[in-house]
Amino acid sequence: MQSNFNLSPSPSTTEPFLWGVATSGYQIEGGYNGEGEPKNNWFLSEQRGSVMKTGAAAEFWTRYEEDFQACQKMGLTAFRLGLEWARIQPSTEISLSAPPAFDLDALDGYTDRIAACRRHGLEPVITLHHFTHPAWLGLDAWLTEDTIDRFGEYVQTTVAHINRRLIDHHQLAPIHWYITLNEPNILVSNTYLSGQFPTDSMLGIGSVFPAYNHLLAAHVRAYNLIHDLYESEGWATPRVSLNTYCSDLYWSEKVIWDLLSLRLRSVDPA
């Protein structure tokens, strides 16, 4: 639906610097993997006691206004808000013959939280996938090409619904910033190399490249879907990316020589 107000980008040729915080829906919202609650791929790990149960988590789903107020007081200008696929396309079962319906109330709930984010002067940066997926996809969802299609359907439905509600219900412009996948390199390595994330695969390193390929294909699919939607609706061009984890390993390679040289340089190691 076309809006009646100006959705054009700022005439400025440079993007503003954003200073903010980042969240994951599963890690902060609460309300997952309990009785009668949506299940994601950590459900079995929680039941087996290999990780703590989610429980109420940080209660973001009910106390988001307090978090936004705290961010505003700290002078932040952005809030990276993670959407939980398992809430948006939920099932209390861990095995299904077909994907379940999308929960429009959940999508409306996320829209309301994004609108509240903006009311507090925070630019929303929306993460569409942060390590977790619905349990009905199986533990090793990213080893199958079908997950690319399922992810595309999720992205298309979610982005279209939330933005149209932002425009029609809240009289706000569409979302400008998206992260399709949070740290896909860590998702793969923690699942198939270090074993920190749940998996049923016995292939180990043999699962790494198939999972990478499917995740990158899913990113491209999401990128194109979002841009195509915005173009067809006449919305301002969005910024869509993924973020990867990188680390400076100086400490593991050089720090010992720094410590050994302290005495030579008359520096107190304390």
Locate predicted features.
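Alpha-helical protein-protein interaction elements
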Residues: 9-11, 34, 53-56, 77, ...
